[in-house]
Amino acid sequence: MGRSFEVRKASMAKTQGAKIKVYSKYGKEIYVCAKNGGTDPDMNLSLRHLITKAKKDQVPAHVIEKALDKASGGAGEDYQPARYEGFGPGGASVIVDCLTDNGNRTYQDVRQCFVKTGAKIGTPGVVAHMFDHQAVFQFQGDDEEAILEALMMADAEVTDIEHEDGVITVFAPNTEFFKVKTALNEAFPDLTLDVEEITFVPQNRTVVSGEDAEKFQKFLDMLDDCDDVQQVYHNADIE
């Protein structure tokens, strides 16, 4: 499909404050997932995936357990999802996903990130159509034909498979995430998935350079500092 999936692995947090932010975001997401779908990872597949992802990002076990205990208690905050869309510095498309217990506060916090960097927050749907909501898996390998055959045998729907420099990337509809993951694990028991996530993959990319590149990085840093922001998706190629 002519797309390249850019893997942005966040470097390990270098300061205690940065680590706490990562732990807090995972704790909130695990709490909401467990509260809505149950605290048993064997029954709640979304929770199982989230816990696996948290462990890969070195979130301590006590943070995960605290979120599960909080969800099982039935009390706690009532977080709701909120999504904001717009154009960042340099015109790149941006989607910001949040979990909030105060929608007005979250909107103002996110809006300030846009305003202070010359970005433009838009109406719902203004850029979502420029992204594909995909399940993405990435791992070391060279035999993409064997991967495709295994997925076809499992009747798993696949959007695209890319192979570059010894790395295979599988794209599938977001609804096929667990089916594709199960098929890969069963067909290739020794396979290590470096990336396994549901994300928004941009259909096209926008080059952001010079002063706009500096502003865009500041924009991302400001969003990262917002407690309610969980994920940021964009199509910027920052130079």
Curated annotation (Swiss-Prot):
It is found in: Cytoplasm. Coiled coil: none annotated. This is Probable transcriptional regulatory protein VC_A0006. It comes from Vibrio cholerae serotype O1 (strain ATCC 39315 / El Tor Inaba N16961). It comes from the Bacteria. One of its GO terms (cellular component) is cytosol. Keywords: Cytoplasm, DNA-binding, Transcription, Transcription regulation. Pfam families: TACO1_YebC_N, Transcrip_reg. GO terms for biological process: regulation of DNA-templated transcription. GO terms for molecular function: DNA binding. Belongs to the TACO1 family. The lineage of its organism: Bacteria, Pseudomonadati, Pseudomonadota, Gammaproteobacteria, Vibrionales.
